[in-house]
UniProtKB/Swiss-Prot annotation:
InterPro entries linked: NA-bd_OB-fold, Rib_uL2_dom2, Ribosomal_uL2, Ribosomal_uL2_bac/org-type, Ribosomal_uL2_C, Ribosomal_uL2_CS, Ribosomal_uL2_dom3, Ribosomal_uL2_RNA-bd_dom
Lineage: Bacteria, Fusobacteriati, Fusobacteriota, Fusobacteriia, Fusobacteriales
A GO molecular function held by the record: rRNA binding
PROSITE patterns (alphabetical): RIBOSOMAL_L2
Family (UniProt): Belongs to the universal ribosomal protein uL2 family.
Keywords carried by this UniProt record: Ribonucleoprotein, Ribosomal protein, RNA-binding, rRNA-binding
SMART domains: Ribosomal_L2 (SM01383), Ribosomal_L2_C (SM01382)
Name of this protein: Large ribosomal subunit protein uL2
Subunit structure: Part of the 50S ribosomal subunit. Forms a bridge to the 30S subunit in the 70S ribosome.
TM helices/strands, residue ranges: none
The keyword Secreted is annotated on this UniProt entry: no
Alphabetical list of NCBIfam families matching this protein: rplB_bact
Source organism of this protein record: Fusobacterium nucleatum subsp. nucleatum (strain ATCC 25586 / DSM 15643 / BCRC 10681 / CIP 101130 / JCM 8532 / KCTC 2640 / LMG 13131 / VPI 4355)
GO CC entries: large ribosomal subunit
Length: 276
């Protein structure tokens, strides 16, 4: 996979770049694994706007992804590697020997025709899923469960990978891409390898219309608004905030104020992501 820089034929294409996905299969998604996706476009169930910088974007079909990997000891063949508009990673369509079809996140190095499986007997290679207790220390993993049987919740974005650092009793030490070190139960499932499509973050959108197509609206700074619209607004020229601290459009403190609530799972964090 490579990044193609567009020729500056127009102002919109001057800095634009695209991913050249030669390895992707240009096929329609598996119909039995797709459902209609109703876009919320930044509104709540009353229709009130809750996020100012989102819009509907292009219509999408949601691909049902197997995050649980609970079909154990049944080999499957990779039929296709496909694009998924709902996530940064690509997805792989698996054909199991018993006839069932499932989508999984496509890890780096997985190719069409490869054989993958899940379970304690699976070998350590990209695409295979095992319990953390059955994996060797030092292996790269993704799609990690936090609760047994709930399905993978961590490390699912393109190009990300966690690392199994150590095993201690029934728990395993996992180092996440952010640098956080976390205890996860050894019975939780994870998939071997790094998530593919690692160059996804290097793409330059290039123009506003392409961002709108993705469902993104303009994000306007408060300093360029009028005083009636934002606490930072008003003044002649480029004025400072004019307050003791930056504020949100609704007058609450912003930038530097901690907003994360304490969770019962905090006790499993061995090292915070901002600690060395």
């Amino acid at each position: 996979m490579a990044i193609r820089k567009m020729k500056p034929i127009t102002n919109g294409t001057r800095h634009m770049s695209r991913l050249v996905n030669d390895e992707l299969d240009k096929v329609r998604p598996e119909k039995s694994l797709t459902v209609p996706l109703k876009s919320a476009y930044g509104r709540d169930n009353y229709g009130h706007r809750t996020c100012r910088d989102r819009q509907k974007g292009h219509k999408r079909l949601y691909r049902i992804i197997d995050f649980k990997r609970n079909k154990l000891d049944v080999p499957a063949r990779v039929a296709t590697i496909e694009y998924d508009p709902n996530r940064s990673a690509n997805i792989a369509l698996l054909f199991y020997v018993d006839g069932e079809k499932r989508y999984i996140l496509a890890p780096k190095g997985l190719k069409k025709g490869d054989i993958v499986s899940a379970g304690s007997k699976a070998e350590i290679k990209p695409g295979n899923a095992l319990k953390l207790k059955d994996m060797p220390v030092g292996v790269q993993i993704h799609n990690i469960e936090l609760q047994r049987g709930k399905g993978g919740q961590l490390v699912r974005s393109a190009g990300t990978a966690a690392r199994l650092v150590a095993k201690e009793g029934t728990y395993c030490h996992v180092e996440l891409p952010s640098g956080e070190l976390r205890l996860i139960h050894g019975e939780c499932m994870a998939t071997v390898g790094e998530v593919g499509n690692s160059e996804h973050n290097l793409v330059n959108i290039g123009k506003a219309g392409r961002a709108r197509h993705m469902g993104k609206r303009p994000h306007v700074r408060g300093a360029v608004m009028n005083p009636v619209d934002h606490p930072h607004g008003g003044g002649e020229g480029k004025n400072s905030v004019g307050r003791k601290s930056p504020l949100t459009p609704w007058g609450k403190p912003a930038l530097g104020i901690k907003t994360r609530g304490r969770k019962t799972s905090d006790k499993f964090i061995v090292r915070r992501r901002n600690e060395k």
